[in-house]
Amino acid sequence: MKQLRLGIAAGAAALLGGCALYHPLPLAHGPDLAGRLAALRTEVPATRPGAPARRIATDSPLDIDDVGFLAVLNDPELRSEPGQADVAQASLLQSSLLPNPAASVSYGALLGGEGTTPAWAASLTEDLKSILTYHTRKKSARLQTQQVNADLLWQEWQIAQKARLLALDLYYGQQSLDLGRRELGLLDREVKEVQAATQAGNLDLSALAPLLTAKAAAEQAVASLGLTQMQNWQALDALLGLDPQVRFAIAAPALPPLPADLAPLLADLPDRRPDLVALQLGYRSADEDVRSAIIGQFPAFAVGGQWAQDNTDVRSGGPTATFDLPVFDRNQGQVRQTRATRLLLNEQYQSRLDDAFGTVKGLDAQIRRLSEDVRNASVAAAAAEKISASARRAYAQGNMDQRSLADFETTALDRRIEALALERSLGETQITLTVELGLGLPQTRIVPARKS
């Protein structure tokens, strides 16, 4: 009896040892924003087998690619990525488990009558239907886990893309803002000189009106640019997990090279872009669900054995089989639902694929047009700046008045601002094209693992 009690205790301890335990997970009580760039995560994991990890230097101007990496490493919205991956892995684990066998035990104590012994009965059964669908269920769960990973990678790409575009806009926006302030300074100086001349009676008051109009337009443009810069900085700080007041230097953008031929890149685009890969995996998972639903048409079937003893000490035992009679429910609804889901995913994938191909070709056409516009605008800006330099020399020699010089200088600044705007549009389009082609970003997730 003592050995029996020890055995029961050991078995109970073994069962409890394999059980999960509860641990509290308190919520945060305040923000977790970094107050400076150096406080961010800066180590980029290896993105290819055998490649070393690298650390982003935050003590020098950042290029737009590094800004994108910092956003992926530190974006508050991406902090839930490890949790989503853990949920998918847990679902896969659950689908990988076979159903537990069912056991039943009953005991009937002898209370009176002609019986000689207590009665008891025991049975053990296993659901065969769950075993039949085990392979398809596990494969579907594995594909769903891979789909989650591809979706999470696409989220990283979108965050990196948004950060790179913001960094590009901030760089060119600052260049335009500096030029706009220079133009405003020139106009302000010219307005003051004309005002002095009109007060002295050397110029008619009508000469002041166009200058005031130009100055008001320049003030509005500078104010609008300043507000846009502030909004872009706040958006970028939010992506980086920084306090909204943090500012840092952004290096001149090095734009990705344009592909010489789109055909080979479009040919394997479905295997390279994470969102298309995720849709393919989702479709394959839905296809396995269809197979599982078809197998589920067969009635539930459980087999096992039972053993019993009655009050007269007569013992019996033998196999058992329990099954449903598929008179009403033959899993028709589940089969129809899984087929409809598979068809929906098929159509969604085709729609996304068509959109991807159309977007790539459209962006390529825009780049060709913008490249020509940038060349023309750069030539015009250089010509205007050359004329402005000649005007300054003429003014220094006394061969030109202040008003004419200001006109030449503001025209040169306007031309350069127009060229910068076109360069920014070209850069945005080129960066967008690289992502649409599935290029320029890692093919593996780089979000840091969850802290234990």
Locations of regions flagged by a protein language model:
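Terminal intrinsically disordered/low-complexity segments used for targeting and assembly
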Residues: K2-L70, G226-D268, T432-S452
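Periplasmic alpha-helical coiled-coil/stalk elements that build and connect Gram-negative outer-membrane
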Residues: Q3, Y134, L143, A150-D268, ...
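Small/polar, glycine/serine/threonine/aspartate-rich low-complexity segments that form flexible
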Residues: G50-S60, P101-T133, R137, R247-D261, ...
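Transmembrane beta-barrel architecture of outer-membrane proteins
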Residues: D66, A119, L165, P210, ...
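A glycine-/polar-enriched beta->alpha junction
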Residues: F69, L73-S80, D86-P101, E114, ...
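A short glycine-centered flexible hinge/capping loop motif at secondary-structure junctions
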Residues: T198-N202, Y395-N399, E436
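C-terminal hydrophobic structural anchor segments
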Residues: L370-N399
